[in-house]
Amino acid sequence: MATADTPAPASSGLSPKEEGELEDGEISDDDNNSQIRSRSSSSSSGGGLLPYPRRRPPHSARGGGSGGGGGSSSSSSSSQQQLRNFSRSRHASERGHLRGPSSYRPKEPFRSHPPSVRMPSSSLSESSPRPSFWERSHLALDRFRFRGRPYRGGSRWSRGRGVGERGGKPGCRPPLGGGAGSGFSSSQSWREPSPPRKSSKSFGRSPSRKQNYSSKNENCVEETFEDLLLKYKQIQLELECINKDEKLALSSKEENVQEDPKTLNFEDQTSTDNVSITKDSSKEVAPEEKTQVKTFQAFELKPLRQKLTLPGDKNRLKKVKDGAKPLSLKSDTTDSSQGLQDKEQNLTRRISTSDILSEKKLGEDEEELSELQLRLLALQSASKKWQQKEQQVMKESKEKLTKTKTVQQKVKTSTKTHSAKKVSTTAKQALRKQQTKAWKKLQQQKEQERQKEEDQRKQAEEEERRKREEEIRKIRDLSNQEEQYNRFMKLVGGKRRSRSKSSDPDLRRSLDKQPTDSGGGIYQYDNYEEVAMDTDSETSSPAPSPVQPPFFSECSLGYFSPAPSLSLPPPPQVSSLPPLSQPYVEGLCVSLEPLPPLPPLPPLPPEDPEQPPKPPFADEEEEEEMLLREELLKSLANKRAFKPEETSSNSDPPSPPVLNNSHPVPRSNLSIVSINTVSQPRIQNPKFHRGPRLPRTVISLPKHKSVVVTLNDSDDSESDGEASKSTNSVFGGLESMIKEARRTAEQASKPKVPPKSEKENDPLRTPEALPEEKKIEYRLLKEEIANREKQRLIKSDQLKTSSSSPANSDVEIDGIGRIAMVTKQVTDAESKLKKHRILLMKDESVLKNLVQQEAKKKESVRNAEAKITKLTEQLQATEKILNVNRMFLKKLQEQIHRVQQRVTIKKALTLKYGEELARAKAVASKEIGKRKLEQDRFGPNKMMRLDSSPVSSPRKHSAELIAMEKRRLQKLEYEYALKIQKLKEARALKAKEQQNISPVVEEEPEFSLPQPSLHDLTQDKLTLDTEENDVDDEILSGSSRERRRSFLESNYFTKPNLKHTDTANKECINKLNKNTVEKPELFLGLKIGELQKLYSKADSLKQLILKTTTGITEKVLHGQEISVDVDFVTAQSKTMEVKPCPFRPYHSPLLVFKSYRFSPYYRTKEKLPLSSVSYSNMIEPDQCFCRFDLTGTCNDDDCQWQHIQDYTLSRKQLFQDILSYNLSLIGCAETSTNEEITASAEKYVEKLFGVNKDRMSMDQMAVLLVSNINESKGHTPPFTTYKDKRKWKPKFWRKPISDNSFSSDEEQSTGPIKYAFQPENQINVPALDTVVTPDDVRYFTNETDDIANLEASVLENPSHVQLWLKLAYKYLNQNEGECSESLDSALNVLARALENNKDNPEIWCHYLRLFSKRGTKDEVQEMCETAVEYAPDYQSFWTFLHLESTFEEKDYVCERMLEFLMGAAKQETSNILSFQLLEALLFRVQLHIFTGRCQSALAILQNALKSANDGIVAEYLKTSDRCLAWLAYIHLIEFNILPSKFYDPSNDNPSRIVNTESFVMPWQAVQDVKTNPDMLLAVFEDAVKACTDESLAVEERIEACLPLYTNMIALHQLLERYEAAMELCKSLLESCPINCQLLEALVALYLQTNQHDKARAVWLTAFEKNPQNAEVFYHMCKFFILQNRGDNLLPFLRKFIASFFKPGFEKYNNLDLFRYLLNIPGPIDIPSRLCKGNFDDDMFNHQVPYLWLIYCLCHPLQSSIKETVEAYEAALGVAMRCDIVQKIWMDYLVFANNRAAGSRNKVQEFKFFTDLVNRCLVTVPARYPIPFSSADYWSNYEFHNRVIFFYLSCVPKTQHSKTLERFCSVMPANSGLALRLLQHEWEESNVQILKLQAKMFTYNIPTCLATWKIAIAAEIVLKGQREVHRLYQRALQKLPLCASLWKDQLLFEASEGGKTDNLRKLVSKCQEIGVSLNELLNLNSNKTESKNH
């Protein structure tokens, strides 16, 4: 602010910034102000504050007014525009100053004027021309528009005060521009902060208006106290300079005002506001304020205090007024006498004096225009006088047309009278001379006045400064910063500086920069608004005295002086303005002293009154003022439209801007000076302090309709002319403007031409921004333009005169008119071009600023969003930590509780054991040993006994110890609570390491325990991963509800409070010792080279595929290949999926029973009406009834089931149902639509019954219809029923099925089979309503379904296990709250259940599974120990087993489980116990094998079967189980693994036995036999011997050992020892002659040795011996058919069937007899007497399945293909054993294959065959229960694979790949099929596809080792080394204990040249989880050892 902004382009007279800011100010007005206005609706202070959406007219309004803070708006558009233009240039600073003193500078971006340079008020007035008339008019019009709105509050006062007063209510933020000062500030804000200003520190948000006070706060926030003081001093200096300038300006202005008494009269009224301010200030610093008048220092609110005019001042002003009135009268007289000439003369005087002045005054004028707006009030009353004067002037001008016309008057007249003729050359010269003289005179006057003012000001300021400096020194000496701040604020407040503009210019700058923020705030605090309003009459009050732009700045200062920091003394810079500002200021000063007259520029008495119209801003509040303005605008618009000459007058306005430019003072200096000046007035007028807004006595100003006349800037053609004159002499233009306003009022009816904002924004009006030289040049140009304008005006006057008086000739008028027209056009074009350019520049600068602001805002928004995101993340993290900490606290508390219990128990036990020890010493050492052994062996039982017996009287000592321990533990509890976080971190790290070391056994969802149905709560999958419990707690499931706390609050814990004895100490010790002993040594013996050798010997991909697929296809039944076109097969595969059912629908004989209604017996015997729902209904037979509807009411609107209302017939439907039996009766056909039939039925009924329809009941009508139907059909009773199915019948409307109607079906199906095709005719039935789930309750709530009820129930009946489980899972599945809370709630329930049922293994199993999700590994182990201690049960041991993760732990639990089972078996033996023993034994063996311990596995199994010890496991096994155990042993010897038949092929982890069927060893060749054959046979013999139960019959014994015998026979056969095999078979058949397995084995031996006759003889002999044995005959039939001897079967078939009948059956054929035996309905009825009764029901029931097989198998031999198909379909419809169904299907498929192969229409037959295969795969179950378990199932695809492989043999090889892929997609978990597909891809050399398929199978079947190995081998073949690492990692997660995988990875790493460290890490990981690699890496020794075995 130190230097004013350098003048902008000469055109605008403003720095581009300033222009932009001006424009911005306007924009700020428009945009920002609109925003701000909206914010501070009533804060229209300053134009900027004006709430109007777009008040561009006066920049001052925005920039100046608002900038003026206090007075700017009060001085209305003129002052505002002056301020705007003026402030744009150097007065941007003044504007800032104005803004500053009055209230505060709005942020720079929004300031329309340069913030930094605050010119003294005088300089302001000078430099900133008043807003153009049009601008002021526009503002006035805007105000008029918004007059009724709240922002009207921003009338002249609010304008003058800024938001401060009205608009500036503290609550409302001023427009962006800020408060009253916002205009300036906004302009400044738009500009870059003036350099002199130290970077104004923008406080975060725009200070509320109150920040006027807080402006200091702002400084304080951003600047140090020292800085504040320094800036404060600078401001004081600036204010002193401004005061001096003001004094000079005021003195000169007073003279000018005296010259214009009339104008002053009018101005006095209007400017009394401003003048009163100025006057008061002038009293204080009269000369200074006079100088201030020059610049119309709206901001220098110093005069605000003066605003309240004292009587003496008023007299003085009146005197001045009187002096001024003569001047104005004089000029008026001149105008009237000479018409335009008088005006020209006045203008000449004004132009010379006031043109210079007006140029200076243009600033003044513009600011005075604001005052003029106030004067509009005076205009109202004076308008009549002005009209009279105007008439006189017109007359005089007519008379003087011939005389020489003063250029000044002419210019002004021309401005107003656009028709005036061009002034002659002589007139121009005279005008110029007059102008020059007037200019010189004015300058002299100004100099004198300035000298006086400066002297006075200096004295006053010196005193003030001394006082301030003393005060400042005191303040600086204070040590307390707060006290310093308070004192400093007091000091500033005392000076009446608005805090927002604290003396610190930097602060002001910052305010300027933050117009919006600081502006708003300051204005809110601005109390000066009221003062400003009071001082509206004062010259200094900017808004009130629009004529005094200089005062405007000054007034605004004075006005806002209440704002301590805002009061600025007129800056000395004003002195630089004097030439320009003096004349103008003089006029202003004159107007200031005579408060009533607006301070017109020097000698414009008549026109000054016109300037008062500009004050409309002052009276903006009043509607009259607005109306007047509006009228004026109308007139101006009309004149603009109609008078082109007016445009030429626009050329003049620029001159005043030049004046303004000539004295631009550095913004900073100006602002500082103005601040200082203002501060003085404030000090003098304490009433203006911000604090309470003192009522302004001047508030009651005469209300005149304001006419906005922008002297300099008036853009309208008319206003421009006036503006030019006003520029030359501010008031000259006003006079003509006022006259125009009068005309406008008279022409109110004329259409309004809205003022153009462009002209308002014309920056050319502010020449103050120009340098001095250019300013002078500008003035000269202005004078020249004024002379021309005057000539033009004279001509126009002459035209007028000639038109009115005949003295003037038409020719002269025409010539002059033409010239005027041409000149006007040229001027118009030039002015338009200039204005548009200026507007363009302004808009560009505005755009630039807006873009910058947008970028800043975007950045701030981004930052805010980033902060929000960060905070949200922090919040979530904190919540997580909180939850985890809570959880750990609970765990610690539980641990402490447990440990306390253990401690007490152990102490008691210690006492007991001590006593026992003492007793034991007395016993012999042998006894002691025994006891020790007993303790070791039966520790747990002993402990349980101890536990059950209460502790006997513990001693006092132990009680004390317990108490001490308790205290210690409590202390520990507290410490633990503190260490929770650390513990958690440590545990998380440990868990992470453990995860890295040992992959999780199962990748299961974190926690999704399905609620088990109550009958099966043991199905839940066990989660073996106990290392991630902490995480699981938080991730449990998304659908957990906030759990109910009622039940839990009473005693919330997650572990049962069981008084259990110490866990088996001995067992734990044994376990530990065992683990340490068994831990293998680190494998470091082998070198990398050896490992690489082993890797090279490893199985290749081909070997792997061959190994895994051998045995899969060995016994596949091969069919005949059907050669069909490949394209068809491909298409067929698609159709096959769509249409699976080729057979026609089943016809039920019951479907015709509804026609019974047509029988006469229906009514006579049944006595039923035809409407009976039993017969007349719309029931859909394939649609379920709604069970809710059946048992109550169904409230589900979308229920898909049938309801009573759905199938009950209405009256119309009943008639339609009856008529549907003969549609032709009603004229319809079968093809008719429902609508047609319905309509026809209604017509028929209507026609039939007619009038009687309403007299008959429904049943009577129905009876008549029935008789009609019978007659039409020709039926005679009683034969009236219908056998044919109706083509149409009424059906109930089925609700549309929603998309998710089948979701429950899919959710419920847990099976892996998902068939790709959907049957075409499948009915979309909703989910079967099999089980009512807890969420399924619609209408009846089971009492136990509600949690509260369940809680009550379990408390009443605590031993009800199912209720406890149901409640626990209720809590677990709650949808509220967190998952961990739900889990804890469920655990709490189960813990309570265990307290009441601690011996219930079912509860323990559920509890352990849930507890494993939250407890640590140690905690879970401890709870498992507790479980098996309290509830030792097979299931609880299995749960324990699955929850352990390492080999040692699992092996230990398995060993204990075997001991437990053996102990139980000693007491009683049972099949289930025997199976459990076998399963536990084989699990342990499998665990050892899986972890690489084949030798130990073999030893375990061997010891279990034939140990020398008495108590071997085999003793407790049933014969069948013992036989399986021996088979497993032999299989292990031979293949180093257990039989795969026992286990689920898709899960290679150690698991439970799923299948106990016997099997044959999978030897393929002699080489496969590893063991010595004789030794192997000896083992078989041992096995048979061990499995033979002598108590059984021979046949039973053979059958029990049959699996062993069949394997012995197979071994003999493999070894090609056929004779031995045959001998064995025959010997066995002697005891079991009809054992089909043995018979088949013998036949196979004969066939292998090509003894077909003997083979046939075997079957024939067996059949002859057992003619009624259907099983034997079936096998015989199969044999004959396979031998292609089917034709030979018929006699045997007859013989076989005859065995069931007595003689007499001969007349019946075989099929009829079979139908009779199988109870198949047929055409012939066979008497029952012919059937033999020589077989009992049991035997016959055993035979029936084979009878069906024989019936189907032999059917093709005796009947057609169609009947054979029907026979197979009938057989499949009979409920039979699964194995029989499979045999029927295989026979059926073979039949279909043969049929298709031999058919001519292969395509159709193959389609039938394919559909049949699909049906078979779909209908045959693949889910089988695990032995002795009804809850656990496994998927057995063995039969499905046989069917698929058979189908493949019937399909061309080219289709195998697609077929296999399709079946794999249908059965994704079918491991056998997956391996077959991989084998096929390998055979086709599709390694890439093989790799992809294998990788897919690793996801579908994640626990199948074979697929992992093939996938890895494929990657190795394709060199995908990185993928190999990933596959190993994934595989070991699924199969963590698989030694084979670990070995492969180790060898792979070694082959890759892996580092030794990596290999050692692998080995150490293996050791950690208990995997042994020793045997796998020493395969030779393993082999020899196994052979030795």
Curated annotation (Swiss-Prot):
Residues 20-32, 527-537 have a biased composition (Acidic residues). It comes from Homo sapiens. Subunit of the trimeric poly(A) tail exosome targeting (PAXT) complex, a complex that directs a subset of long and polyadenylated poly(A) RNAs for exosomal degradation. The RNA exosome is fundamental for the degradation of RNA in eukaryotic nuclei. Substrate targeting is facilitated by its cofactor MTREX, which links to RNA-binding protein adapters. Residues 251-262, 280-290, 392-402, 444-479, 501-515, 755-770 have a biased composition (Basic and acidic residues). The gene is ZFC3H1. Residues 33-44, 114-132, 183-192, 201-210, 574-583 have a biased composition (Low complexity). Its main location: nucleus. One of its GO terms (biological process) is RNA processing. Residues 430-440 have a biased composition (Basic residues). A zinc finger (C3H1-type) spans 1185-1206. InterPro entries: HAT, Putative_zinc-finger_domain, Red1, TPR-like_helical_dom_sf. Residues 266-279, 330-340, 647-671 have a biased composition (Polar residues). This is Zinc finger C3H1 domain-containing protein. The modification Phosphoserine is found at residues 15, 28, 34, 128, 251, 352, 383, 662, 714, 717, 719, 805, 809, 948-949, 953, 998, 1046, 1301, 1303-1304. GO terms for cellular component: exosome (RNase complex); extracellular space; MTREC complex; nucleus.
